[in-house]
Every structure is written in C-alpha cells, then in structure tokens.
C-alpha cells in the first residue's frame, strides 16, 4: 500500500477534484490524488493577489503489511512534528531570564511514554503542582493505554476531563502508581487528564 501526508494542503480528494464531498461506499477507480493547494471550495485565484511563489510538501511512502499505527499514524506524525531538542546555558545578559542551574544533568533521560502505538500525546502542560495531558487515539482501535510519566513526577491521581480541561462530573480519579496510570480509550477518541 501507499501512505500519503500533505501537511501544507490537507484538503485532498481521490479520483476526482473537489472538496466537501464524502462517501462511505464509493469505489475508487484510479490512484489519482488531487490536492487543493488553497484549501477552499471556491477556486479563489490567490496568485492574482499574493505575490511570490507557492510551494507545498507531499510525503509519500510505501508499506508491505497494513497496520494503521505503523503504516499511517507514525510516519505521518514524524513528518508533521519532527524530533527536536533544546539546549539551555545561562548567558548573564540582563534582558534574558537566567534560570537557576546547579548540579549536573544526565546525558539522557526518558520523558513521557505510552505503551501502544497509534495514540498521540497532543499536549502536556505543567502548571505548578498540576499538569494537563491530552492523548488522541488515531489508529481506529480501542483498548487499554498505559501512560508512564517522567521519572521525578510527583503526581498521585489522574482526573478525566473534557476537551475544555474541565473535570468530568462524577468521574473518579485514576491512581498513579510507579509514575504510571492505565485508562481505556476508544477508536479515534481524545482523552484529557488533569494530573494532581
């Protein structure tokens, strides 16, 4: 099979041009993929009023055996959010905030980990003694997921929340033991937790 990711032009159609047309039962007749460069249905001629050149990236890859996490989710996410790192060294400059640095940092240190492929961490924000974590199942399969937090985390309970970050009424917190917790996630479902 073939995987396709168009991060600059997410509006695509297969077999014939056009966006906004959906069918669960259509039989594909060709391998033609049309990408809507301007991501609209009105055919605005942007080149008439936006100067310069236009470019878009397309990533195409093949796979031998289909598995949504390995064939689609992981390769697409790697093209959208490539690995990045940051290095901090105090500068002594008056306009820069110089964080307290003492001791040595390890050469490597594991961060947040999930026990299954196809579930993405879409946000992890710490605020004082709390943190909000959002996970999204993208492979279309339900089941248990285990989150392992960074080594020195002090969180004890994960409370289910809605997409606004508000605790779900009557939902009991999930105990965090050995820096990890388990929860059930449905196909293509987002799950948000407040860690305390």
Predicted features and spans:
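C-terminal (or distal) subdomains of carbohydrate-active enzymes
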Residues: 1-196
């Amino acid at each position: 099979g073939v995987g396709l990711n168009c991060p600059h032009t997410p509006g695509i159609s297969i077999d014939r041009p056009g966006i906004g047309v959906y069918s669960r039962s259509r039989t594909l007749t060709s391998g033609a993929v049309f990408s809507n460069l301007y991501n609209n249905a009105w055919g605005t001629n942007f080149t008439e009023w936006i100067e310069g050149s236009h470019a878009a990236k397309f990533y195409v890859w093949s796979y031998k055996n289909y598995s949504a996490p390995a064939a689609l989710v992981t390769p697409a996410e790697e093209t959208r959010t490539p690995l990045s790192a940051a290095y901090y060294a105090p500068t002594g400059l008056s306009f820069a905030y110089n964080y307290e640095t003492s001791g040595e940092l390890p050469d490597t240190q594991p961060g947040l980990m999930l026990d299954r492929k196809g579930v993405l961490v879409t946000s992890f924000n710490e605020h004082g003694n709390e943190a909000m974590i959002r996970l999204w199942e993208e492979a279309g399969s339900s089941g248990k997921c285990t989150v392992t937090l960074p080594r020195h985390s002090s969180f004890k309970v994960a409370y289910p929340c809605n997409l606004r970050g508000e605790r779900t009424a009557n939902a009991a917190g999930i105990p965090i033991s050995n820096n990890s917790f388990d929860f059930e996630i449905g196909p293509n479902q987002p799950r948000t937790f407040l860690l305390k």
